[in-house]
Amino acid sequence: MAEFSQKRGKRRGDEGLGSMVDFLLANARLVLGVGGAAVLGIATLAVKRFIDRATSPRDEDDTKADSWKELSLLKATPHLQPRPPPAALSQPVLPLAPSSSAPEGPAKSDPEVTPQLSSPAPLCLTLQERLLAFERDRVTIPAAQVALAKQLAGDIALELQAYFQSKFPELPFGAFVPGGPLYDGLQAGAADHVRLLVPLVLEPGLWSLVPGVDTVARDPRCWAVRRTQLEFCPRGSSPWDRFLVGGYLSSRVLLELLRKVLAASVNWPAIGSLLGCLIRPSMASEELLLEVQHERLELTVAVLVAVPGVDADDRLLLAWPLEGLAGNLWLQDLYPVEAARLRALDDRDAGTRRRLLLLLCAVCRGCSALGQLGRGHLTQVVLRLGEDNVDWTEEALGERFLQALELLIGSLEQASLPCHFNPSVNLFSNLREEEIDDIGYALYSGLQEPEGLL
């Protein structure tokens, strides 16, 4: 009975409090409007429930239910902007920002009210715009660095030639000439080597060239330098006869000699101190490489022993670390004719073939799966495309880029990329099947989404 009286008294108290709430809400609608009355009602209800929780214990389940209901009710309540002061009523009122919790659906709105955007929409760049941005950020080299690299390479060439003249006074060398992509405007970033040619001066009439396919190596990339006129000029008449192997000038013997000289004989610390840089011969590579470190840049100088202009075609042959039966042969260097042909094609129609080559080189260097594609492969692709009479203006650079990817994929499917100047040479012959598959997959993915390569 006492418990019933307690509940009844509580109910009466609730009825009195409820009447007071109703009275406040009824008058609040007139003063504050519907929205203000709703806020006042929720606040009053929260105070009432707080008093109820303090005066009577409640079940845990009921407490949890009321809690998430109140939370959802508060989330669903629109946040009203404060009313402007009376003095500002004549001023234009800014539109209210839409609430993120407002229910979705069609709603009538004033056509003069424009939504306020918090941040601008992201720009959608075209492939052409992305290529130009990639070229600016990843391909172009500052002119100051180019000038410094040329100066260092020229100084190293002079110092090295002076040393060779003192070390081998009996061997006639030509002028040590630095060159390569850096000097031809074909340098893609700082990864390309500076080519330092060390030409051999051979006596006219004592030497002739034999195609590599006519030797035991059967290699169309190479040539053999044969000693002739032995009956009139016996062996020993030429200072280069000391490098003969089986009647042929051996590139391997010359490479071994120069490797020992560059690694152990040249005083690189003294030369580096004189030039203001650090010079170290690379011992890890089979090529003759010099690593140059300057406070403003780093570059690699490739020392290339060359045999120039032995025949009427003025071929340039390099002593290259070849394997097997071709170890004593000389590799034909196609870089000079490739660079000259690209320059001639671009000059003919003010084209962008060389820019396309630089973009492809930078893209392949930036993707590990495409690292096997070197400058030689990409140059052949651009040359094949460049001979076509199509649009080579800057506006068509994106289209030519995709066309180059398609040509590479087609060549990989056939595992064949013929040399532009010697179709019997397949530039993909040294790639394994697994490498071809990896490169092809990366290129196919890049063709579907070219932006992923940039």
From Swiss-Prot:
GO terms for biological process: mitochondrion organization; positive regulation of mitochondrial fission; positive regulation of protein targeting to membrane; regulation of mitochondrion organization. Residues 88-108 have a biased composition (Low complexity). GO terms for cellular component: mitochondrial outer membrane; mitochondrion. Does not bind ADP or other nucleotides, in contrast to MIEF1. It comes from the Eukaryota. Residues 44-454 are cytoplasmic. This is Mitochondrial dynamics protein MID49. Pfam families: Mab-21_C, MID51-like_C. Mitochondrial outer membrane protein which regulates mitochondrial organization. It is required for mitochondrial fission and promotes the recruitment and association of the fission mediator dynamin-related protein 1 (DNM1L) to the mitochondrial surface independently of the mitochondrial fission FIS1 and MFF proteins. Regulates DNM1L GTPase activity. It comes from Pongo abelii (Sumatran orangutan). Its main location: mitochondrion.
